[in-house]
Amino acid sequence: MRLHVVDTHRAIPEKEHPAQRCVGTSKTVRVENHEETSKSGSSLDRNPELQSFQQNYGEDPLADRATDLYRREFVMGFVEKWDELIDWDARAESEGQFFIDVLRAHGKASVLDAATGTGFHSVRLMEAGFDVISVDGSAAMLAKAFENGRKRGLILKTVQSDWRELNRSIHGKYDAIICLGNSFTHLHDEQDRRKALAEFYAALRHDGILILDQRNYDEMLDHGFSSKHRYYYCGDRVTAAPEYLDDGLARFKYTFPDACEYTLNMFPLRKNYVRRLIREAGFELVRTYGDFQETYHESEAEFFIHVAEKSVTSNLRLLDRRGPASRRTKV
């Protein structure tokens, strides 16, 4: 597998955004491009992933459960609409300072955002003063993230990388790695999950922390799906719900106000399974929160957030040096 560094400084400049019109269904979505590229060629010409506007699952979408599938799922038409699902303002209000507080309580400064998406957490952490490297496997997502950062006066440092070979793409060690937005669920094979966690572990300093989240698939598998759009996916005009669910696949359909529909094939990870994988990767302590709360009801939480410490002893020493106030922080 070859890794690519994306030049998002030129990925999709505003003047080169194609006019798009959804003309597909939930099985196959096509977006027509009505703007010709310049004679010199835009970056859409240079990067094949940024030219893709059609989701393609093959003859049987339910059988397509490969880890690399997300690159064909996050096509430009879907990525351009993704922030309608997120709703940055509502999401910022719902999660508050949770991630910022956790990182500060542990004395962390450098953060690798392993699942940048459209840049929500990279931007928030940069605005809070953290040194952030923004990583994603999708060139389209990184291009949108860079654009979102630029609109807010920030220049994101972006790298396109596969988690399974992360350390071939990045340099140095980091205080913290965040893998948010239910992104770990895109790994359909257990060996891929273990490899990704091993890469995260290796990229952290000796006292580093990993923050990884997931949907409450336990409740979904055992009792069915329900969502109040309180956290993460806060756009109240977008419908997100599984159209197929079994122990090995959660196929979600996303319906937007203009009737455009896209889908994602994900692996429904159970909470304790993820906790076990994290510990087996070498992390000494894993704390799990439900919807940003230390105390929660398993059946009511929409999302779980795992905070894993690489070295408990080192972090306890740090908290002791920072005084009693830091020890009272919920981390």
Residue ranges of predicted features:
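A short SAM/SAH-binding and catalytic strip from SAM-dependent methyltransferases
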Residues: D175-Q191
